[in-house]
């Protein structure tokens, strides 16, 4: 990676990112050693600072920071502590090297960004971050979005938002003691009223844009306050926000000097996530995230401090490549498949799997395959059993916290189940195009209810099986002899004897050559046709 890895604005070194993508986490770690910042600023609200740091400190175990405005929430906002996320990597690096980390974002109620298809971030390795960002910023979608922001930004005030938020909180606290549980009739009336209002999509868009403007003004205000105090600031922020933040930094008169402590949430909790649920929390294939964790361990602070040559230092930092891990997934699955099913996958089929997954990826306008492309390639070239092995290897996340220090939330694609049996709706967005395990592109395979269930059933019923090993061995040897004899006969029938001209083909036909040598003095060869 010889290209620039950051965007510089005065004394701020910016890494615009896509969240939960390991390529951007790699950029953050590389840029730390290029910049050696006095301060790291991240796009997270300050009123969950301690919980996020606690979650980062317990990595590689996965955590989920859930927070809400009420004490008994039905809908939770959450921040996944994803090891492959660039913001989490920035916080982790700051804690590791004892660099101050500032959370500069504004906390908003029920903030939900609209979904969108993102380009493949693997291209950063070839074109560099500034060029990658420039291409995205020039897209019509982002140009139109920025134009909408400029139209309504004058009517959006961060200070007014804080004042309204404080009043809203006070009003809610006064009503909490008096309000009773809403009846089903009231809920139905509310739903009917909401259905009659039928808000327009444009209004939803404006509300979302207003929230983005509030956040960007608040982040710009914090950066303006910090810039005179530090020589080098490393800023890790979402790709869609930097252009507007830069605009407010260039026009400081358009933002207020906001110096208000954000109101803490009434419900903030750290949940442990089991390794088996990692695929619901991580956007990257869990195997990629696992390899990133192992890479960081191998080249930890102690190991990197021993490297003296700068070129060798950055070559090591950039040596993590997802493309090599895709090969490892297929090869590891091949080994497990051959061990369990006693069927061999030859090099030709393995090469075909690589080519198939590559071509399938290109047809989906991507550079590297996601899990879906890996499964389709494995299924179509080999079979469903091999595809299941690929799924198991790719989805495996080996780090599981069994200390029970934190409550564990069970995750699905629909939401999360707390230990007390309370179902909460979450807003996870991952890269898999299916919603349930049954939607995988393979025949569904039953799972054991508990480890060793099938072995236990076999031990219970093994004496009911009509079989006698000595006789079985004799029968199997006889079947093997018949099979071998049949193949030999078929092979002999497909041998053609030809006169030697330019090629020995499959060897000299000794009998035919000797038989005709006395009067023809010609050599004959065998042409064995495959069965």
Where do the language-model regions lie?
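Compositional signal for N-terminal targeting/processing segments
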Residues: 1-531
